């Protein structure tokens, strides 16, 4: 059963919808659906449609730019990809370095034929792989702190990995059964689809469940004086 994130959303005044990435056998329960536009349209070109309650539907036949990261479909050879990322995008100082980074990336192997990205669907919780909070800096600070509530010092729960924007939704996690969180929306190519002050905080399903537990604990940092003082300093709301 999907836990209720209402305490987080309401306390932090999160105005953007929480966005789930689902790996499912049937897209019908996620309607209304939208498909990526022609060519290599960015996954985040659908952001305005997520706000309208619609879900982006990706398949190996219709996938836009997200195919390599979310569906395992390779549009370019490895050599072409390295050349593009280094020579055109300037993301690493050399081809050799970029090769090392690509080798180290966990990657994502879909379980089903349909990847669906859109507002949370409680009835489809079995197929949920990650949840993304689109937040400002204050909201992000509170969520980063909350994600450490149950963690050990030798197991840092939050990272900010290198990847494309869509890769930060799934392919950087590796093990989805572990509570993990990432600070995302750091890909310059996708940021034009977001408002300037927004960043992404993407979590695995186990971390989402822990965050909801954290929010329900009256002794947690979501209910402390420092947060109340911060909210007051911001005029009563984030």
Residue ranges and their predicted role:
Residues 2-238:
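Acidic, serine/proline-rich low-complexity intrinsically disordered regions
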């Amino acid at each position: 059963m999907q836990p209720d994130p209402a305490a987080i959303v309401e306390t932090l005044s999160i105005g953007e919808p929480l966005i789930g990435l689902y790996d499912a056998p049937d897209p019908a329960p996620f309607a209304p659906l939208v498909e990526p536009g022609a060519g290599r349209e960015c996954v985040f070109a659908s952001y305005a449609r997520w706000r309208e309650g619609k879900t982006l539907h990706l398949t190996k036949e219709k996938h836009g730019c997200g195919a390599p990261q979310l569906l395992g479909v390779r549009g370019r050879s490895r050599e072409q990809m390295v050349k593009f990322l280094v020579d055109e995008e300037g993301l690493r100082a050399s081809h050799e370095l970029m090769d090392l980074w690509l080798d180290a990336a966990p990657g994502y192997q879909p379980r089903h034929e349909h990847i669906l990205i859109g507002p949370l669907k409680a009835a489809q919780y079995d197929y949920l792989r990650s949840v993304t909070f689109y937040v400002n800096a204050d909201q992000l600070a509170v969520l980063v702190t909350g994600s450490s509530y149950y963690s050990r010092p030798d197991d840092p729960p939050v990272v900010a990995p290198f990847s494309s924007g869509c890769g930060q939704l799934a392919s950087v996690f590796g093990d989805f059964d572990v509570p993990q969180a990432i600070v995302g929306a750091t890909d310059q190519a996708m940021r034009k689809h977001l408002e300037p002050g927004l960043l992404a905080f993407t979590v695995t399903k186990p971390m989402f469940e822990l965050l909801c537990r954290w929010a329900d604990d009256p002794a947690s940092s979501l209910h402390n004086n420092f947060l109340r003082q911060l909210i007051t300093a911001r005029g009563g709301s984030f």
